[in-house]
Amino acid sequence: MKRSVMASLFLGACLFSAGAYSASADDKAVDFIRRADEVRSPNKPFRYTLTIHEFKTGATQPDNKQVLDISMRFMKPEGEMKADARSLARFIYPPRDKGKVLLSDWYDLWFYTPELRRPVPVSRQQRLIGQISNGDVIVTNFEYAYDATLKGEEPCGETQCYKLELVRKSAEVTWPKVDYYVEKEGDNRPYKAAYFSLDNKLIKEVLYQDFQMVLGKMRPMKIVVKEARHGKSYSVMTYSDVRYESLPESAFTRESIQRGAK
């Protein structure tokens, strides 16, 4: 009887210890993605130019090009400031695309062109150019969109990374699962993200590169996107002219883009 009680106490202690470790690891995972989110996007409204180049297999020069002028209201609650996740992507190049606009309001995405009477809903997975989908040009808040689990450490080039498994919190989130690699040291800068389908097939990989001091923090100014099913073809997103901006909330509405986004 005494041995049985001791065994039960030992088993209970082990389960408690494992549970405490799991909770601690999950808390760390949330902290890591929060810090990486802060690297990818400041917690203030900002604006930037996004240039996308598509490279075919074996090509040294881009086959296609798209330029967007993007305004972001992507903020987490802080003091009296409420959470927000809206963006406005204006098409600049090629010239035939001028006047087209993508409006993102949390998980809703709308497309407008002067030929249409009103904005129409579109999918974030819909292809925009090359390996880039509509959702790729808009910053994703991983902390809000995914539950995170710390899976361990792996080498990332010349540094060491934490590997995080992200599982979406709702069906509204575009990708069901993401393997997310963030640097172990410093600000937990994002290194790579691998996106998976519902049946756990790799769809694409995203590499964060060319970190520069922008808006008070080292941020990736280049993102390389590779799709698993397109061989060695890839697309490159380059960020420039990044600055703070204070567009009114009213600018991020379907009515506003019909009148002409500024």
Predicted regions and their residues:
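Bacterial N-terminal signal peptides that target proteins for export
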Residues: 1-9
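Bacterial N-terminal signal peptides
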Residues: 8-17
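Flexible, processing/modification-adjacent segments and terminal tails
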Residues: 23-45, 52, 60-64, 95-176, ...
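Extended lipid/amphipathic-ligand handling interfaces
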Residues: 36-37, 69-78, 208-213
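Edge/loop elements at the starts and ends of beta-strands within beta-rich repeat scaffolds
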Residues: 37-46, 80-82, 213-217
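N-terminal, post-signal-peptide region of Sec/Tat-exported proteins
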Residues: 48-82
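Functional cores of ribonucleases/endoribonucleases
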Residues: 70-103
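Gly/Pro-enriched, hydrophobic low-complexity segments
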Residues: 108, 118-122, 137, 159-254
